[in-house]
């Protein structure tokens, strides 16, 4: 009787150990790509969050980013001083102040997206058709993992 030989199945811990450093390095490269725009990766991340949630308050932003409210206030103050965000009274509750990305902040975010996309696309062009298809196939399940 011949034993059926199958390819070993990757377990979650093995995949996580291989994927984690790749994602960290990719994130580091994408953050470096915007250095010349005068914003840090963390500032760009906050701007994108505020852009997705116009009118978000400092406390809500701090909770979302898992930071203290006083710490977030400092980051928000720097973004405001740089002219990248504005504080506006809420339309529902005038006592509440919300954050919005300013026109200059929108310009910076367009540049951030453009540079990061160009950098990543240049590297993806170096893959074979099958490798590119494999990366494309992996995007949806990875997105589901982080959306949970």
Question: Where do the language-model regions lie?
Answer:
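N-terminal helix-turn-helix DNA-binding core of bacterial DNA-binding proteins
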Residues: 28-70, 82-84
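Generic structural concept
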Residues: 16, 20, 43, 47, ...
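Charged, amphipathic alpha-helical coiled-coil/dimerization segments
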Residues: 55, 77-140, 147
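N-terminal leader segment of winged-helix/HTH proteins
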Residues: 1-41, 141
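Short, structured helix-loop boundary elements
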Residues: 12-16, 20, 40, 69, ...
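A short, structure-level motif marking secondary-structure boundaries and short turns
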Residues: 15-16, 32-33, 42-44, 59-62, ...
């Amino acid at each position: 009787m011949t034993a059926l030989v199958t390819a070993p199945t990757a377990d979650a811990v093995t995949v996580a150990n291989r994927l984690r450093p790749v994602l960290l390095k990719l994130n580091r490269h994408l953050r470096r790509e915007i250095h010349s725009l005068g914003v840090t990766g963390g500032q760009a991340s906050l701007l994108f969050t505020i852009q997705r949630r116009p009118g978000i308050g400092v406390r809500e932003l701090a909770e979302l980013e898992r930071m203290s409210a006083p710490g977030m206030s400092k980051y928000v103050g720097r973004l405001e001083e740089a002219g990248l965000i504005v504080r506006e009274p809420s339309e529902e509750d005038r006592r509440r102040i919300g954050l919005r990305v300013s026109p200059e902040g929108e310009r910076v975010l367009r540049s951030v997206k453009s540079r990061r996309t160009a950098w990543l696309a240049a590297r993806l062009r170096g893959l074979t058709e099958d490798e590119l298809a494999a990366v494309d196939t992996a995007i949806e399940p990875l997105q589901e993992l982080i959306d949970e």
